[in-house]
Amino acid sequence: MSSQKLLKEEHVSGLTGGSIGEIYVVTCVNLTAYVAWALLRKRYGDHSPWDVDFVIFDFLLNWLGLLLSVTIYSNQPLLLNALIIVPAGVWYIWGRRDRVKKRKELRPDFQQEKDKEVKRADKEMPFLSVYRGSMMVITCIAILAVDFNIFPRRFAKVETWGTSMMDLGVGSFVFSMGVVSKPRTDEPFGPQMKKSLKHAFPVLVLGFIRLISVKSLDYQEHVSEYGVHWNFFFTLGFLPPFVTLVGGLFKKTKIPLMGQSVIIALAYDVLLSVTSLKEYILTAPRVDIFSQNKEGIFSFIGYLAIFLAGQAVGTVILRTKLPEPTPANSKRTPHNLRYRQIIKYLTISSILFHVARLYYDGTIEINVSRRLVNMPYYLWVCAYNTFFLGCYAAIEVILVPIRASQPATPRVPLTLDAVNYNGLVIFLLANIGTGLINMSVNTLEASPAKTMVILVAYCAALSGISLVLYKKEIRLKL
């Protein structure tokens, strides 16, 4: 084993994380960037999102803003939030007079475009796209930034017990996949499983490619994260068939998706508490293929529960019906009435998940463990994501409303739309880029200036590739 590989492994080992409150404040930059983008959109709504200056603004807000939050401004997240939102607010207010003048010059076919935009917004739920895109961006940034000293160790994955931003990110990535996954159908189990296996196969292939690459190139590994051979692509790849299997097992029951998720999480947590499973995962020697990958195998149960929770939330969001008209809501648009119901659901869900997590933390005194993906971790991931989903939805309703007096403009930042268009491909490219940079640069000895140049170039490359693919309507399915 090379000394540099050993040093890099030690760099991400034995960590204890940081506070949940700080994680929330740091990741609020996602929301702040969306607010700033929405304000700029309101001022320049009749401009094309492909204008060079707009693309640059978009990239600065939704990529570099997140990068700065976990590097240079990691100790001053409130200041960074202010530096993003205050200039955008001033710029918006300063341009209100110009915006009023431009409204008088709208083209005759404007209302037709507005109707199309309303239909698209109701179908696609723009705030979901912003949420998912932001999740992918911060994930891509973190998997490389963690290898540099400029990335705080408290944000990196903990060894066993504790909370960190990257620990939350892994679970949130799975949760977000569940949110945007297709709802279950009444199709027979056999055809469903066939489709699931077909969907899982390319991702599992990527898992094997990563495994072979890591072993053959003597790349640094954090074995206690998933095991000797297991990696995150295997976790993602096995989700579709097991989700289908769970659907088949619960098909004849009336238990809702969220109930199924909680049952799986609770059953797994009981096994961790009343049997020797927890000790086996944490301390058993790695003597065979199963024990060598015990973390990845058993944590998959928790990730399955998290995915189902995300799927349950996504199903409710996409299937929320308009409330019955009343004198109190007769003046509100159907679009906003629907969003009020969604925000109400997300708020209640977030409160319940937060209360349950606090109960585990204060009464049962079981700590969060991403390595185990135990019940406190499950509750934390669900609480965080329902809270932030509600915030994204509220921002959209308040700052990105559909009104007849405004131009029919995009409702999702272009760089995030582009990332979502080829999400898994961009994630794969981020992993490849991370590997190439680690093999060509001694990340532990890089100066802060050199580090930021590398990270900005990396972000620009990923964003640029996603924009080119999106512009040319090239969707690469894995």
From Swiss-Prot:
GO terms for cellular component: endoplasmic reticulum membrane. It comes from the Eukaryota. It is found in: Endoplasmic reticulum membrane. It is a multi-pass membrane protein. Pfam families: GWT1 (PF06423). Disulfide bonds: none annotated. It is an enzyme of class 2 (transferase). The chain crosses the membrane at residues 20-40, 52-72, 75-95, 126-146, 160-180, 196-213, 230-250, 255-275, 297-317, 380-400, 424-444, 449-469. Its main location: endoplasmic reticulum. GO terms for molecular function: glucosaminyl-phosphatidylinositol O-acyltransferase activity. InterPro entries: PIGW/GWT1 (IPR009447). Its EC number is 2.3.-.-. The keyword rRNA-binding does not apply. The keyword rRNA-binding does not apply. One of its GO terms (biological process) is GPI anchor biosynthetic process. Keywords: Acyltransferase, Endoplasmic reticulum, Glycoprotein, GPI-anchor biosynthesis, Membrane, Transferase, Transmembrane, Transmembrane helix. Probable acetyltransferase, which acetylates the inositol ring of phosphatidylinositol during biosynthesis of GPI-anchor. Belongs to the PIGW family. This is GPI-anchored wall transfer protein 1.
